Amino acid sequence: MKRKIFPVVLSVLLLSAAGCQSSGSEKVVKAPVYPVEEVYKYTFDALGEDVMPIGGYYAPFGGYGLNGEYIESTITDEVYKGISDSGLNFIIASTIDYSRDHDNAVLSYELAEKYNVMLFMRDSYLFSLDSPYKEAIEADKFAKRLEEHKKYASFAGLYGRDEPFGFEFPYLKQVSDRFYEVAGAENSTALYFNSLSYQCSEGMLTNGWGDGNIEESWTLDIYLDEYFKATEGAKFYTYDLYPFINGGNFRSTYFENLQLVKDRTAEEKLPFFTFVQGGGKFDNQEEYDIPDEGMMWWSVSTSLAYGAKGYQYFTYTHPEVFFNGESGTCGLIGRYGEKTERWYYAQNINRHTAAIDHVLLNSAHMGIIANGNSPAPIPEKGRLESFRELKSVEGDDSIIGCFDYKGRAAYYAVNNSTIKDKAKIVLNFDNRYAYEVIQNANSYSLKGKSLTLTLAPGEGVLVVLE
């Protein structure tokens, strides 16, 4: 499949009237050093503390029958190599049960280990947070079973529940308490939960599809209050909200949800991950558009600009549960293990993330500067007019994530458009500085009082003052 790569150009804006030049002999001011802000992050012990978690939902499947056809297993060497080659470093095996599908679970662990991929595994012997619910077993038995999983270097933790409803929170709390009682806090072994978001109505936040009996409706804020109580001890927070809908529209609550999550996880001293819409239509759901490269860049870039410490693609594989969907529409790989064009988009995006994650993981998010228009409304809360040495932003529509990086200022400049190519974003500083600029995984050393960045649709560029 032909790989599409947008052209990437980086230039320095030369303002001779202000005495700004790009020559190596130019005198620059050393950037001030500020008190270091506290940072909350989660990384896998096996991968290192400077490797950002980049994941995929739905690990490769065992074989199954579909409409008279047998779909071969995608739990293969080739497919797991593809996970690693795409730049993902963890995968969620939400439908592979270590208890009931042991052989495929073990094979998944072994292949993930071979390709340095971490894996969250389901194990219904320990508990079940899907109906019929099953509380976590006694601590001693839980600990013994957990040791079986820990034999595999690819073991990231256990899969808990995707998109739990409020009426299920008592079950979550019992399981979460037992898990962290046994697993402990001083390691990266985690229990995977994924939260609901503004995609759901207030009634669904509490009682789901009518299965619960909570009388009052919850706002998302109330849902999060109860969610954090139920998942006390969690090592990260993650949620999904898919923005590309209805033939070119954006979900209007996208940035509102990002800001809310940023604020609430800061209160809880938790890092947060987002989901990236890696496909569309899903199970023939026409509401969800199939994203192009600019849309996927935009999802990742805006998440990072708001301080996300990791992200995941939905879906990575084409899951069995989407049996109505056409292969190749809903994820990075199709039903038969074939790579879609979005696999290549993700690979390019993830390559850039791997070049900047050592900075963003170790940076405290301080707010954003928004310039121009936006495809979805940006809340006033969290917005800044300037940040430290950066005094103004000009040019095309943009979001600038503002960070404290070990006492220095760092900025993540994003083209806030999924279609505008060669967008010009001008960063104006209060003096002449030296900068490290990382764009499309390439690093540049630049000097000046202003920088002009030329960005592809949705692209993000990291700027660190030296």
What is each stretch, according to the model?
Residues 21-23:
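Bacterial signal peptide processing site
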Residues 3-9:
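Sec-dependent signal peptide recognition
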Residues 16-19:
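C-terminal motif of bacterial Sec signal peptides marking the signal peptidase cleavage site
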Residues 27-430, 438-466:
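Glycan-processing catalytic domains of CAZymes
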Residues 11-14:
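Secretory targeting and sorting signals
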